[in-house]
UniProtKB/Swiss-Prot annotation:
One term under GO cellular component: chloroplast
GO biological process: electron transport chain
Organism expressing this protein natively: Thalassiosira weissflogii
Role of this protein: Ferredoxins are iron-sulfur proteins that transfer electrons in a wide variety of metabolic reactions.
Subunit structure, as described in the record: Forms a complex with heterodimeric ferredoxin-thioredoxin reductase (FTR) and thioredoxin.
Chief place of localization: plastid
PANTHER family: FERREDOXIN, FERREDOXIN-2, CHLOROPLASTIC
CDD domains the record matches: fer2 (cd00207)
InterPro entries from the UniProt entry: 2Fe-2S_ferredoxin-like_sf, 2Fe-2S_ferredoxin-type, 2Fe2S_fd_BS, Beta-grasp_dom_sf, Fd_pln
Name this protein carries in UniProt: Ferredoxin
UniProt binding sites for [2Fe-2S] cluster: C42, C47, C50, C80
Amino acid sequence: MATYKVTLISEEHDINTTIDCNDDVFVLDAAEEAGIDLPYSCRAGACSTCAGKVTEGTIDQSEQTFLDDDQMGAGFVLTCIAYPKSDCTILVHQEDELY
């Protein structure tokens, strides 16, 4: 099991925090454990409430069913089903940016 540094950023919500996240823990769950309040709804990768955008690093979100190829290609990720695969930076609170 690897542990990665995940940096979560939202200027609008005054978030700029780096957390430790194991490669078998969803980013949303690790953020909650660290006391960071991120938006979520379904927790199953089937909506866009928890959307973020990866600006650096690699994420495994193979369990998601909502985002299309273009959105994923642009770096969008659903934090509720996203596992880190490297140290990474994620802009959070990005649901409005999807559309």
